[in-house]
A protein has these predicted regions:
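N-terminal Rossmann-like FAD-binding beta1-loop-alpha1 element of flavoenzymes
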Residues: 6-33
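Conserved Rossmann-like nucleotide-cofactor binding loop
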Residues: 16, 39, 262
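Glycine-rich FAD pyrophosphate-binding loop
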Residues: 25-48
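Mid-domain catalytic core of redox enzymes
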Residues: 27, 229-333, 337-346, 350, ...
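Conserved flavin/dinucleotide-binding core of flavoenzymes
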Residues: 46, 97-101, 317, 321-457
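Dinucleotide-binding Rossmann-like beta1-alpha1 core, especially the glycine-rich loop
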Residues: 50-120, 124, 167
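Feature captures the FAD/FMN-dependent oxidoreductase FAD-binding
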Residues: 66-95, 133-139, 219-226, 231-241
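Active-site/ligand-binding neighborhood in enzyme catalytic cores
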Residues: 115-232
Length: 457
């Protein structure tokens, strides 16, 4: 890179920011990562409590393909199993999605939908689900779950959300068979950017998911600069010309941001192009981890609870990763949809734990006798909400980006998309070459004017 080309500014020291700098370095582009907090990793944090239980904040699962691409393939454990079921009541737990095809009322409803072809607005999530799966399955399972983690009625949500759900049933059948044959948690629809295959399976890195962030950070040309909040992104004629980090102006023609897209407009000085993203909403989560005696308390790793429970999903992670809990003990994670300040969010820890324990009886009859500890985490940025009100702007962000030359919004929160760590990696691997080329293009290189004079204040 030319000495006159200023480094790329990467805002955020979580996995998306670290991977951005990692990929830029692969293309010989200098980048400085600035993290507002005192440590790297963002949501992807791991720790072990005094009772010997290991916790991950953020994604639990990654694949062997992803870790191999990062050079971490030799430092991971293979997950022996992974599966999802849906609680339908009466002791019925059909597997998702295959087992639902064996429920007679769902099959009949879907067939009737195909035969009668009722008029439906396929831009609306409620109508799209009913069209694709039949009204009974949609109304009893899919839509209640969608509404629980989105926080909006399904007739106010965009059908784009359905594109995030795997629908290739034949492929799913084959991959399920591969799971049984290989006794590995073969990936099924977990990553949207790269295809599922029998040789791609879930693994867990030594040191937890936070170890991935540390591995990437340790191999960057420059140390991540901590406690350095981004305060401004300077724009002239809809082109990035600089940034202010922790009170210091920095000249650059390229900023890669991992901030939530609805907060990014607050930093922009010199353009209102991003104001349309201010009304985007994220749904929060209240995560309740229960420590229990025993194991194999749930019928499968994940149990979806579409009706009759205050949470939409219950997970017994030690069924997939036995090593995260002491022998003879397990953890049950209950996920409740919430918004900052609402009735669920403001419950005390004791109250929200009691709400979970008091309703888990249909799944774990002797739950009270088994519980001996709990922890609660409130995550304000759980899921992006694909509301119809701003679907046009959301689609434009996905196809056209921010609209400001040299400003790239990446990662789950930055792209406002239902993607996980591995999706972010493969997207960046495809995007970064063009970003690097533009950044080093002579027509985009700035002069050597000091940043204090070049950047407006």
């Amino acid at each position: 890179m030319s000495a006159s080309t200023p480094p790329v500014v990467v805002i955020g020291g979580g996995i998306a920011g670290l991977l951005s700098a990692h990929e830029l370095a692969r293309h010989d582009v200098d980048a400085n990562v600035f993290e507002a907090g005192p440590r790297i990793a963002g949501m992807a944090a791991s720790h072990t409590d005094p009772d010997g239980f290991s916790y991950d904040v953020g994604a639990h699962f990654v694949t062997n393909r992803f870790l191999a691409a990062l050079g971490m393939g030799g430092s991971c454990r293979t997950l022996p199993r992974y599966g999802e079921v849906v609680h339908l009541g009466g002791g019925k737990y059909p597997h998702y999605p295959m087992g639902l095809l064996g429920v007679p009322r769902y099959v009949t409803s879907a067939a009737r939908e195909r035969l009668l072809r009722p008029d439906r607005d396929l831009r609306v999530a409620a109508d799209r689900f009913r069209h694709d799966y039949g009204p009974r399955l949609a109304d009893e399972v899919a839509l209640p779950l969608l509404e629980a983690w989105s926080g909006l009625p399904a007739d106010q949500l965009s059908a784009s959300v359905i594109d995030k759900i795997p629908t290739s049933l034949l492929h799913t059948i084959w991959l399920r068979a591969a799971q049984r044959i290989t006794r590995r948690a073969v990936m099924i629809g977990y990553c949207k950017e790269e295809p599922s295959a029998t040789g791609v399976y879930h693994v867990y890195p030594a040191g937890g998911v936070a170890a991935i962030c540390q591995h990437v950070a340790d191999r960057l040309p420059h140390r991540v600069q901590l406690s350095q909040p981004a305060e401004r992104i300077y724009v002239e004629d809809d082109r990035v010309v600089g940034a202010r980090i922790a009170g210091r102006d920095i000249e650059t023609n390229t900023v890669v941001s991992t901030l939530p897209i609805n907060r990014l407009p607050q930093l922009i000085e010199g353009s209102d192009r991003l104001d349309r993203f201010r009304r985007f909403q994220f749904r929060g989560l209240v995560l309740v981890n229960l420590k229990l005696t025993g194991r194999e308390l749930l019928p499968e790793v994940v149990v979806w609870t579409p009706q009759g429970f205050p949470y939409f999903r219950v997970t017994e992670t030690p069924l997939s990763m036995p090593w995260i809990a002491p022998e003879g003990k397990t953890m049950i994670l209950c996920e409740l949809g919430a918004e900052t300040g609402d009735d669920v969010w403001t419950l005390t820890d004791d109250a929200v734990v009691e709400r979970c324990v008091s309703t888990l009886g249909p799944l774990i009859p002797d739950i009270r006798a088994r519980v001996f500890g709990a922890s609660v985490l409130r995550q304000p940025l759980g899921y992006p909400v694909f509301a119809l009100d701003y679907e046009q702007e959301r689609a434009a962000l996905a196809t056209d980006g921010t609209g400001i030359t040299g400003l790239y919004s990446v990662g789950r929160n930055g792209e406002f998309d239902h993607i996980l760590m591995e999706d972010t990696f493969w997207r960046l691997r495809r995007r970064i070459p063009k970003i690097a080329q533009r950044h080093t293009s002579p027509s985009n290189c700035h002069s050597t004017t000091p940043a204090s004079e070049r950047c407006p204040t």
